[in-house]
Amino acid sequence: MSQPVVVIDAKDHLLGRLASTIAKQVLNGQKIVVVRAEALNISGEFFRNKLKYHDFLRKATAFNKTRGPFHFRAPSRILYKAIRGMVSHKTARGKAALERLKIFEGIPPPYDKKKRVVVPQALRVLRLKPGRKYTTLGKLSTSVGWKYEDVVAKLEDKRKVRSAEYYAKKRAFTKKVSSASAAASESDVAKQLASFGY
């Protein structure tokens, strides 16, 4: 990738496949920001994935529950934990790699104005057979105790309205510029200059 910061839109990506790609890149020194973590997908039906998460919730230190493992409910933390498991996070190299990673639900500023990319090898439509069942990470998180799905959805609706307004203005401006340049190229002065080789 080799850009200063790569912003990945996680919508409709498979959790594990995206995590492995990101883990490789952050270890190689690439700074990565992941947005819309709540729109990630996990293969398999919702009920099965919920049972798997409840199995994970039962894992705890027998004599002192505060010692871990810690069961994060937010989609951003679930993705972070998946990536952390693919990085040697207890070494200096692994810690430095994880510091190059940021994960968000929704698309907060300033990343709403940055160009976002997708990871083709992790996209659900390219990886899952059509008709196979899948689960949205936001839905799974909400079912196990994440409380902010409505808040993120509301903020995303506002962002989409702002984005549509900006795009409409940009399109109108581009149209004006193209029509003005077309008019200028058809003028008598332009024809005369063209005859002199300009």
Curated annotation (Swiss-Prot):
GO cellular component entries: cytosol; cytosolic large ribosomal subunit; nucleolus; ribosome
Q: How is it modified after translation?
A: N-terminally acetylated by acetyltransferase NatA.
Q: Where is this cross-link: Glycyl lysine isopeptide (Lys-Gly) (interchain with G-Cter in ubiquitin)?
A: 176
Q: Which domain of life is it from?
A: Eukaryota
Q: Which SUPFAM superfamilies match?
A: Ribosomal protein L13
Its family?
Answer: Belongs to the universal ribosomal protein uL13 family.
NCBIfam families assigned = L13_A_E
Protein name listed in UniProt: Large ribosomal subunit protein uL13B
Q: Which source organism?
A: Saccharomyces cerevisiae (strain ATCC 204508 / S288c)
**Name of encoding gene:** RPL16B
